[in-house]
From Swiss-Prot:
Its EC number is 3.6.1.31. This is Phosphoribosyl-ATP pyrophosphatase. It comes from Methanococcus maripaludis (strain C6 / ATCC BAA-1332). InterPro entries: HisE (IPR008179), PRib-ATP_PPHydrolase-like (IPR021130). Pathway: Amino-acid biosynthesis; L-histidine biosynthesis; L-histidine from 5-phospho-alpha-D-ribose 1-diphosphate: step 2/9. HAMAP family: HisE. It is found in: Cytoplasm. Belongs to the PRA-PH family. GO terms for cellular component: cytoplasm.
């Protein structure tokens, strides 16, 4: 299984099951509007960190912060009810 698909699947499961101690469950359990706002703040924060790492030309930090950005974007997508398959289909459309 593709590692990104596996992470996405885990995120979806944790949103549904809300296991105790799960970061994803904690981030997504408020009412939907509040949860989405919190997730959007994290996406913005992580995007800024990627930009700063890129400006510093710090490859290791770019990779680390990009993983955080992609993760939090996946949480936002999953919380919004978007499946991995829907996202994959959008990428396929753009490969023309």
């Amino acid at each position: 299984m593709n590692v990104l698909k596996e992470v996405y699947s885990t995120i979806e499961k944790r949103i549904q099951e809300k296991p105790e101690g799960s970061y994803v469950a904690k981030l997504t359990t408020d009412d939907k509007k509040t949860a989405v706002n919190k997730i959007c703040e994290k996406v913005g924060e992580e995007a800024a960190e990627v930009i700063l790492a890129a400006k510093d030309n710090d490859k290791a930090e770019i990779i680390y912060e990009s993983a955080d950005l992609i993760f939090h974007t996946m949480v936002l997508l999953a919380k919004s009810g978007i499946t991995y398959e829907e996202l994959s289909e959008e990428f396929k459309k753009r490969m023309k």
